[in-house]
Swiss-Prot record:
Protein's organism: Mus musculus
Modified residue annotations for Phosphothreonine: 290, 293
In-chain residues carrying the UniProt-annotated modification Phosphoserine: 268, 276, 279, 304, 306, 324, 358, 362
Basic and acidic residues bias (residue ranges): 319-336
This protein's UniProt keywords: Phosphoprotein
Keyword Membrane applies: no
Protein name: Uncharacterized protein KIAA0930 homolog
Region (Disordered): 262-307, 319-340
Superkingdom: Eukaryota
Keyword Hydrolase: no
Alphabetical list of PANTHER family matching this protein: KIAA0930, ZGC:172139
Biased composition (Polar residues): 262-278
Amino acid sequence: MLRAIAEERGRLSLRREVCGLGCFKDDRIVFWTWMFSTYFMEKLAPRQDDMLFYVRRKRAYPGNEGTIDGRKAEAEPEVEVEVYRRDSKKLPGLGDPDIDWEESVCLNLILQKLDYMVTCAVCTRADGGDIHIHRKKSQQVFASPSKHPMDSKGEESKMSYPNIFFMIDSFEEVFSDMTVGEGEMVCVELVASDKTNTFQGVIFQGSIRYEALKKVYDNRVSVAARMAQKMSFGFYKYNNMEFVRMKGPQGKGHAEMAVSRVSTGDTSPCGTEDSSPASPMHERVTSFSTPPTPERNNRPAFFSPSLKRKVPRNRIAEMKKSHSANDSEEFFREDDSGADLHNATNLRSRSLSGTGRSLVGSWLKLNRADGNFLLYAHLTYVTLPLHRILTDILEVRQKPILMT
């Protein structure tokens, strides 16, 4: 099936060069309706869903406001995704002119014929450029043409097509041990494969450094909540979770991370991991010449309107900085900052408890910048445009890095 689609796409490119667009439209409809009928209506794999997805393009007719020089401008057709059971009597007829049969085939291919595995890893980079994976977690995910907010359960799903979502509803349980500290970075990789696992292809890779995550988290968290924590000498625990986006290379899709601060009294393994070179978490992977470095994005941050205290100018400037994750121009890209690997080890070995501070010491530290602390980084979803997934599957087929 994949070979037939790739060959048809190749013929399409060739015909465009020879005779231009439109001269072979009927021929293409015949091909794509045959593909739809053969691979989705007649052949039913053991694990295949009994649902069929149709991409319908409704013709839109503009009103008077849609005119240019007295002529009606051609309006973009409205796109809808219709879902039917395979045995439904209301199935659209093969050859229905309002159905985009090519996109319908591609959508059903992505939703039903492929398996997806997402891997989230916490890594550091050595001075020589080698990447060390400290821990990683892989989880099977499923493609969907709809989405729902991850910060509130029970809300209705909304159609997201042509963007395809790969969601992890139980992200806190799945990635419970994904904590990131100073000098570390979070890497995400999404891999597609066919049902027989005869081929694998990376369709998303992204990364974000701890320093960028912490900056976003600090900007998002209410200043009042942090002040209350300091005034209570560490007894007040701010446990807010912030959702941060990580853009893919060249803007190809994005991933979302649920970021929260590790509690100072946390006794989970994330605070007691053995970081010695002999530890299996320091598994050496292949040398990469391009470690991830996120680029800054300036977007307004949340500010609590109830805060009456005058805020210094430098703090106001900080709050105006980015609250979204940065582009990963390449998955592993050379970084000039020279991150120190020992920082991550020292952070995990020292005590994070703030309850032993003296009264005077706490007051003196009120106006100081917060020190580094561990952050939970839970992957919630990855989303990609359908056409980018197809290109990576049919043409690129990049080999996985984190899954090896």
